[in-house]
Amino acid sequence: MAEKQTAKRNRREEILQSLALMLESSDGSQRITTAKLAASVGVSEAALYRHFPSKTRMFDSLIEFIEDSLITRINLILKDEKDTSTRLRLIVLLILGFGERNPGLTRILTGHALMFEQDRLQGRINQLFERIEAQLRQVLREKRMREGEGYTTDENLLASQLLAFCEGMLSRFVRSEFKYRPTDDFDARWPLIAAQLQ
């Protein structure tokens, strides 16, 4: 029984990995059909549906992975780091690095892979970015409490600026067919971003 569950879980993971790889390839700029995905995995479409009731559920699983990966690591940064600037830098670098290491998933983060899918999926990505922006806003607000001095610019504006930078770099990565990596020249870019945090 345990072997059957493990085999089923492994097949589910194989399907999700194939979908992520297809999103990373030139297929990712077009609608991915279950027929193409089944061919990529080497199974029938019916076999896909034994593991996932719909393609939407496959995307849901990938979005869950993205959410868990980013939010868990952001929470670790907040737990381990106390300096506001360091926290912000590490969160931004985390988002950019995650996108760079997972090009197919970056197509989901930017919405490119979801254009042909249910609107609900884009809504989940929007919620994820709202959560990240709320985390950034909280870090910015805590500066006054932690360091005795806050920012002169509204924290809402600063948080949205940081997130817009991340989204822009991820979009550039996708638009360039993954040529321009989001973390390229990050050490030179960060002082420009940090200078806006006043």
Swiss-Prot record:
Taxonomy, superkingdom: Bacteria
One GO BP annotation of this record: cell division
GO MF annotations, alphabetized: DNA-binding transcription factor activity; transcription cis-regulatory region binding
Classification via PROSITE patterns: HTH_TETR_1, HTH_TETR_2
CC annotations in GO: bacterial nucleoid; cytoplasm
Coiled-coil boundaries: 117-144
Function noted in UniProt: Required for nucleoid occlusion (NO) phenomenon, which prevents Z-ring formation and cell division over the nucleoid. Acts as a DNA-associated cell division inhibitor that binds simultaneously chromosomal DNA and FtsZ, and disrupts the assembly of FtsZ polymers. SlmA-DNA-binding sequences (SBS) are dispersed on non-Ter regions of the chromosome, preventing FtsZ polymerization at these regions.
Name recorded for this polypeptide: Nucleoid occlusion factor SlmA
Source organism per UniProt: Salmonella paratyphi A (strain AKU_12601)
